[in-house]
Amino acid sequence: MAGHSKWANIKFRKGVQDAKRGKIFTKLIREITVAARMGGGDESSNPRLRDAVKKALNANMKRDTIDNAVKRGVGGVDGEAMIAMRYEGYGPGGVAILVDCLSDNKNRTVSEVRHAFSKHGGNLGTDGSVSYLFTNQGEILMASNQPEDKVMEIAIDAGASDVAVEDGQIEIITPVEAYHTVLNALQDAGLEVEQSHLTMRAQTLVPINDETAESLIKLIDMLEDLDDVQEVYSNAEFSEKILESMN
């Protein structure tokens, strides 16, 4: 679990830094618009929208920009309809990779994703080729110095499936259906959540050497830089050396 937690923290910090340079605002706006179009503009009754708005706020997006994206989604105007799609493949070292996208042009998206895999020693697979290696779950990372016993008690009582503590970081894993119940219970108790999201979590991590890790990181970075890509997941287990170099 520690490997999952550290990688999530690195991705979180990198995302905030990238957002300050304007690299991910387009993706965030796209997710907010689609979430509002699919589930309505009320955050209290639309969990996907609530999570998307939280990500945007964490990335320092202005509330006016968020509200405009919600209005576009609810109104169903401005541009082609976005379609959610997922691509599966293998990266360097046989690492399994899932790529979640939102796009108005499937041909463009699959071409760009395939090019990224090919350029960095991977290959795009067929539907179902690696998705069975992942489970859709909720992940909640608590802010530092939160009371461990209290967090564990509240999380488990609310339906969490696992709670782990390492180096002062508390990570909570939930079934999808219990994710918002657990998150709300923690926040209602006055506990501080650092980050939370629904994720595709690898059932088993695959250890890779540092050379493979460097190639894999280049592939993941290239995928994440594509406008149509929203999330990239892998089952790689990075060494402490690599994790520290990215921290």
From Swiss-Prot:
Swiss-Prot/TrEMBL keywords: Cytoplasm, DNA-binding, Transcription, Transcription regulation
Gene Ontology, cellular component aspect: cytosol
Subcellular location: Cytoplasm
Keyword Calcium: no
GO MF annotation terms: DNA binding
TM annotation in the entry: none
Biological process terms in GO annotation: regulation of DNA-templated transcription
Family the UniProt entry places it in: Belongs to the TACO1 family.
PANTHER family given in the database record: TRANSCRIPTIONAL REGULATORY PROTEIN YEBC-RELATED, TRANSLATIONAL ACTIVATOR OF CYTOCHROME C OXIDASE 1
Name recorded for this polypeptide: Probable transcriptional regulatory protein lpg1286
Origin organism lineage: Bacteria, Pseudomonadati, Pseudomonadota, Gammaproteobacteria, Legionellales
